[in-house]
């Protein structure tokens, strides 16, 4: 049960809750498209604390809360908040919790959301902590796979790009261990999946590593593409050595199954060519669209009756 619980890691969401969120997300999507809003949380307030830039995640959380009839108070620029004066994360969270019923936080330091949860009894939702995890994106990604392809089990998921710093990758590969899937990892050597993420998997048998996307593109059901995380590199020469390592274009997509999808947590830089956008496999804008109903479902599971 997620009632009044924090979601800091994808491990905080058990399978029963996950499938309930999927069903509720479908209902929320239908409500949005027919009525616009589902005023189920009219007396609730969400605080959003974003210490890192965000467009889709912040807007989708705020839209989700508004569509549920709730209110939002936000800090989207820490330069204009007391954090600029040296206020600790703990004190900011304590203050935000006194003004709200739930807190959504994004922070550049891995583990910040878990730390924040120690200083409040209010639910904390992790909207991304450095190169750690991004659990709500993972719920959205799993929902997208299920909605687009009918099921998650039996699929081949190929992840390509920045597997070292990409927190969406880390959360998703952990969650996929619950399903009957095969996962292909394609990246430059220096952007391989970190060993600590491997250590969180029950086994490695469903995961294989490759350097060449051509080896696995034909068997792929879900091509999950990520940008190279420039902001995570301490050595910009290292970044320059890997930028543009993989670029998905229409020729790449022609080698994929007809019934397959390309996903991306966005924003993209140059890893997916615009000539892919109108191809039937391109699901990344639909994926972003599903973000609001999925987050509505999660928020309601936490705060609803």
Swiss-Prot record:
SUPFAM superfamilies: Aspartate/ornithine carbamoyltransferase (SSF53671). The keyword Transferase applies. It comes from the Archaea. GO terms for biological process: 'de novo' pyrimidine nucleobase biosynthetic process; 'de novo' UMP biosynthetic process; amino acid metabolic process. Carbamoyl phosphate binds at residues 56-57, 106, 134, 137, 266-267. Pathway: Pyrimidine metabolism; UMP biosynthesis via de novo pathway; (S)-dihydroorotate from bicarbonate: step 2/3. It is an enzyme of class 2 (transferase). Keywords: Pyrimidine biosynthesis, Transferase. PROSITE patterns: CARBAMOYLTRANSFERASE. Signal peptide: none annotated. It catalyses: carbamoyl phosphate + L-aspartate = N-carbamoyl-L-aspartate + phosphate + H(+). Its EC number is 2.1.3.2. One of its GO terms (molecular function) is amino acid binding. L-aspartate binds at residues 85, 167, 227. Belongs to the aspartate/ornithine carbamoyltransferase superfamily. ATCase family. Heterooligomer of catalytic and regulatory chains. HAMAP family: Asp_carb_tr. Catalyzes the condensation of carbamoyl phosphate and aspartate to form carbamoyl aspartate and inorganic phosphate, the committed step in the de novo pyrimidine nucleotide biosynthesis pathway. NCBIfam families: asp_carb_tr, PRK00856.1. This is Aspartate carbamoyltransferase catalytic subunit.
């Amino acid at each position: 049960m997620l009632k009044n619980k924090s979601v800091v890691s994808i491990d905080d969401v058990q399978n029963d809750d996950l499938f309930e969120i999927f069903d509720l997300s479908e209902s929320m999507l239908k409500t949005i498209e027919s009525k616009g809003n589902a005023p189920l949380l009219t007396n609730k307030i969400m605080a959003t604390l974003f210490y890192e830039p965000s467009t889709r995640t912040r807007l989708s959380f705020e839209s989700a809360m508004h569509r549920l009839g709730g209110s939002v108070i936000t800090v989207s620029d820490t330069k204009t908040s007391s954090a600029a004066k040296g206020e600790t994360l703990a004190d900011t969270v304590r203050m935000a919790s006194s003004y709200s019923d739930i807190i959504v936080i994004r922070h550049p330091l891995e583990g910040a959301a878990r730390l924040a949860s120690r200083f409040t009894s209010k639910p904390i939702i992790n909207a991304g902590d450095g190169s750690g995890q991004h659990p709500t994106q993972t719920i959205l990604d799993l929902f997208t796979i299920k909605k687009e392809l009918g099921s998650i089990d039996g699929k081949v998921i190929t992840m390509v790009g920045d597997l070292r710093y990409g927190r969406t990758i880390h959360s998703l590969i952990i969650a996929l261990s619950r399903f009957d899937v095969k996962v292909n990892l394609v990246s430059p050597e220096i952007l391989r999946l970190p060993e600590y993420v491997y250590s969180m998997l029950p086994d490695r048998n469903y995961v294989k590593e490759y350097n060449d996307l051509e080896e696995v593109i034909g068997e792929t059901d879900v091509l999950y593409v990520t940008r190279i995380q420039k902001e995570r590199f301490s050595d910009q020469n290292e970044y320059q050595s890997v930028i543009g390592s993989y670029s998905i274009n229409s020729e790449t997509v022609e080698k994929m199954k007809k019934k397959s999808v390309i996903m991306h947590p966005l924003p993209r830089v140059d890893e997916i060519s615009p000539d892919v956008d109108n191809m039937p496999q391109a699901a990344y804008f639909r994926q972003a669209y599903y973000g609001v109903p999925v987050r509505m479902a999660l928020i309601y599971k936490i705060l609803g009756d």
